[in-house]
Amino acid sequence: GRILDFQDFTSSTPSVSLHDDSGHGTHVAGILAGSGQVSSGLYAGIAPDTDLLICKVLDHEGNGNIQTVLKGIDWILKIKDSYPLHLVNISVGGRPTLPPGQKKLLLDAVEHLWDLGLTVVVSSGNYGPRPGTVAVPGTSPKVITVGVPDTLPLFRTGHSSSNYSGRGPTDHCIKKPDVFAPGTGIISCNSRYISSMQSASVRPSLFQRPTFLSSQPYIAKTGTSMATPVVTGAIACLFSKYPDLSNVEAKLRLHNSCQPIPGTESGWGLL
C-alpha cells in the first residue's frame, strides 16, 4: 500500500518526515498492506493495495503514553474528511491497571471514532494469560478487539503455544477479545533494512552498529500487535468489495466468518 500521510507525535515538535526508529509500526504496516516486492510476493500483506495514514506514537524503544495516542487520534479526526478513511488499526494498548481517568480518556477517544462511522480494530495486549488482562482501549464494547489464541492447530509457526494474549472479562463483564488471529512468529517488514544499493552511500561505521542497520528485509515478531493488522487487512478487503458497509455491518460479517477453535475461552473464534 501507499503511505498517504504521516505524523510523528513522540517528540515535542511533531514531524512529518517518514521514519521508524523502533520497527513496530513498520512491521504492523507490512502485515496489513506490504507489497511483498522484496520477497517476490512471498511476504505480502493481507491487503497490499490499501493506502495508509500513519501516526507514530511509540518512541525508539517501543514505549508510548496516553498523551501521544490521544494526539494521534485527534490527528485522525482532523484529517479523516480529506481521505477515504474507513479503518483505524491501533496496535498499542495501555495496561489494564491504568487509573480510571486515563482509561476513560482512551475509551472515549476510540468510541468517538467508532461513532463517526470508522471501523476501529485494536489489540488485546500482551498482559495475559490471567482473566481481566485486556489492554485499554481493547476493553471497549464497540471496537473490534484482537487476541492471539493459546494454540494454533491450523498453523505450524514453530511455537507450540502462545500464552500472552490479554483476555477478559472486562471491568464491565464483557467478553473480550472479539476475534483471534495469528500473532506469534509473524514475518513482516524490517524497518532497519538497507539494500545493497543503499549501503554504498552509507558511512561504513554504521555497519558496525547492527542495531540500526540490517541486510534482512523481513523479520519475525510476536504479539497481539501483529494479529491486529491481520484482522484490519481482512476488513479492508471486505470494504474493497462492499464499500458501503457500516462499521457495525463489518463487525457482524467478521463475527460470522470466524472459525471456533479449541483453547479459546471467549470471542468469536479464529479468523
Show where each model-derived region lies.
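Subtilisin-like serine protease catalytic core
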Residues: 1-7, 16-67, 81-87, 115, ...
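Catalytic-core segments of hydrolase enzymes
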Residues: 7, 83-190, 253-258
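Short beta-alpha connecting loops at secondary-structure transitions
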Residues: 11-17, 159-166, 215-220, 264
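Extended, hydrophobic alpha-helical segments in both membrane/secreted and soluble proteins
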Residues: 24-28, 65, 72, 92, ...
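Hydrolase catalytic cores
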Residues: 29-32, 53-59, 88, 133-136, ...
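Alpha-helical scaffolding within the catalytic cores
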Residues: 39, 71-74, 164-165
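Short, well-structured alpha-helical segments in soluble
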Residues: 73-83
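Short helix- or helix-capping micro-motifs
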Residues: 270-271
